[in-house]
Structure formats: C-alpha cells, structure tokens
C-alpha cells in the first residue's frame, strides 16, 4: 500500500536527531538562535503535526515560532527573613510546562488572535522551540469554516491563559480519567492543590 507524504514526514520526526533531519535541524537552530523570542513564520516546520492539530493554509491562520529557556525558575534570594520552609531558592520549578508558557507568550504578542494549539520543533542545551498555531476570530474565513468557527465564540477568549489548550490540559491533569485523578476535577485549585 502506498504511503502518504505526511507519513514520511511523521516517520522522520520520530527520530529528529538521526538521518537527514538531524543535519537540517542543526542548520535551522543556528538561524533560530539569532532570531527573536517570538517569530511569525510563513509555513509550519512540521506540516503533518500542524495539520493534525487544525492548521489550514488559509487567511486568518497564523503560525509563530516561540523560544523558551529551559531549566527551573530563576528565583532571587530573599533580603528579608523567612522561615526555613519558605526560604527555598534552588530546585523551585514552574507549575506550568514550557509549551504552555510558549502559548501564553505568543498570545500576548498577537493580542487579536487566539491560540489553537502548539507543538515541539526543537531544543538545544539552553532553550526549547515550539510552533504555535493562532487564529483570527474576526476573519470571515475562520468564521465560515466548519472546523474552526468554534474558536470565534466568546467562551474561547484567553484560552491559552486558562489552560484550555492541549498543553494546558496536560499540565492540569485533564487528559486522564479514572483512578488517580480524584483531585484534578473540576480543577487543581478546587481540590486544595492536591492534584499536583
């Protein structure tokens, strides 16, 4: 049976550090390091992944590449007194994953757009790159699209900041059900933060 064009792309991205893709990624990342933290791009780097998440090559659909530094939170040492438990500086981690942070930053950069989804495109020793798909809820091409028009509803405003994207739901424990998820619904906070 003949394989589709997208299946070959998907196969290559399963092992991005091997084969022809490894050299291509090495060249790309040299360019990405010189660019800004948030760059609007013409077309997705991973076309198969972007299309599976809802991307369409049409007006009103924007893709942005976002870089986020790796590592734990950079916490300043307190000048005033604290009890020992509250004095922590090292090993303090974020409560959000880096992908969710990338989505939020792109949402703040493009304020008139709404975040649809995002995916990983690369990383080096100090940062990770994600590509974020954003939609214009006021554009007629989006409003008349049967697959994408749902994002025009007012309930989808600020969805990246409220953990409504896939990365946000993953961080809130919403992608699992049943045993072990007793403290994740309706939210982490409603269960006195016992879900994390």
Swiss-Prot record:
UniProt entry keywords in alphabetical sequence: Ribonucleoprotein, Ribosomal protein
Q: Which organism is it from?
A: Natronomonas pharaonis (strain ATCC 35678 / DSM 2160 / CIP 103997 / JCM 8858 / NBRC 14720 / NCIMB 2260 / Gabara)
Tell me what this protein is called: Large ribosomal subunit protein eL15
Name of encoding gene: rpl15e
User: So which domain of life are we looking at?
Assistant: Archaea
Single annotated GO MF: structural constituent of ribosome
Give the matching InterPro entries. Rbsml_eL15_core_dom_sf, Ribosomal_eL15, Ribosomal_eL15_arc, Ribosomal_eL15_CS, Ribosomal_uL23/eL15/eS24_sf
The entry assigns this protein to a family as follows: Belongs to the eukaryotic ribosomal protein eL15 family.
**Does the keyword DNA repair belong to this entry?**
no
* Any single Gene Ontology cellular-component annotation: cytosolic large ribosomal subunit
């Amino acid at each position: 049976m003949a394989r589709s064009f997208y299946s070959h792309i998907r196969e290559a991205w399963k092992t991005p550090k091997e084969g022809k893709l490894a050299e291509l990624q090495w060249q790309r990342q040299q360019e990405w390091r010189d660019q800004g933290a948030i760059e609007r791009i013409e077309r997705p780097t991973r076309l198969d992944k972007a299309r599976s998440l809802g991307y369409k090559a049409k007006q009103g659909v924007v893709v942005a590449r976002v870089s986020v530094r790796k590592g734990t939170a950079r916490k300043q040492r307190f000048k005033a007194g604290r009890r020992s438990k509250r004095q922590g500086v090292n090993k303090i981690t974020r409560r959000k994953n880096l992908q969710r942070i990338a989505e939020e930053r792109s949402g703040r950069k493009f304020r008139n757009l709404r975040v649809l989804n995002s995916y990983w495109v690369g990383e080096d020793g100090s940062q990770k790159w994600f590509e974020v798909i954003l939609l214009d809820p006021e554009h007629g091409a989006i409003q008349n699209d049967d697959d994408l028009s749902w994002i025009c509803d007012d309930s989808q405003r600020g969805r990246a900041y409220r953990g409504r994207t896939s990365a946000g739901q993953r961080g809130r424990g919403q992608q699992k059900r049943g045993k072990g998820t007793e403290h994740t619904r309706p939210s982490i906070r409603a269960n006195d933060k016992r879900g994390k």
